Amino acid sequence: RISAKHYGIPSTGNGRRESFRQMPIPRMRATYMEAGNVTEEEMISTVKKGIYASSFTNGQVQIGAGDFTFFVKDGYLIENGKLTQPIKDINIIGNGPRALADITMVGNNYKMDNGTWTCGKDGQSCPVTCGMPSALVSKLTVGGEN
């Protein structure tokens, strides 16, 4: 409630804690995106130069501003609509609300994650879930390049 009041928004009940030993703090718990109507292959075919991220690791978000950074654990370079060479350990930087506005296509391949994600905050770690289809984001900073 304190954070919601600080940001001037309604409370959403996202106060969670790792165990009874800690105070609850606001944090993520579940992230989902509804499936669209295009295949992954159709999305990839529209990209002149970009990356296809197969999996992510080590993300951070600046609450309030919405700025984020994630590392692509593994994926592929996209060149002229085709997956070419493998990539890994690439940094992606962006802003959450802006990235959502820059989604140009959403795939029909919705799936739930394997459940290995956690939300780390103030020395606590809580399990979180996410599920989504592939999504084409037109503008993000990748490895320091826009």
Language-model features and meaning:
Residues 1-146:
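N-terminal small-residue-enriched
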